[in-house]
Amino acid sequence: MKIEIKRWGDNDLYTEGQLIVNGKMAIPYTVEYHDNKVQTGTYEAWLRKKGEKYILYFKDESGNERMFIAGHSFKSAWKEQAVVVGDHLIPGAVYRGRNHLARLINRLSKAVKARKKILITFSEDEMQPTNIIRHWAGLKNHARG
């Protein structure tokens, strides 16, 4: 399973982006704070169960273990915001994140059960945030009819 964070926006505090899984958009809006930003590159990830909580970890360029996403269970993760701290990567925290997080965690669960390797890639992209929001708004309107 390939997870990609495409970064496209930047300000003095954080970098905006989107999360793509196996070539398809999974979470349309991510925020990554500058004080602990991950360098571009590909990292191998693994899933751990800690009590009732599932956590996806990866090792960064310095060899530090970093948490990527967490949820109390694959089925109830949508109830939580996808906040990843220590690690300062927050998928979907701003725009329609909870539903997307639940789907992503379910997909990760299936990949782990199938013993598939999980790779996370961080890359830079030229896409603008307004394009993302327009894209998702268009899909929403299209679904209505």
Locations of the language-model features?
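Cell wall/extracellular polymer interaction/catalysis modules
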Residues: 1-145
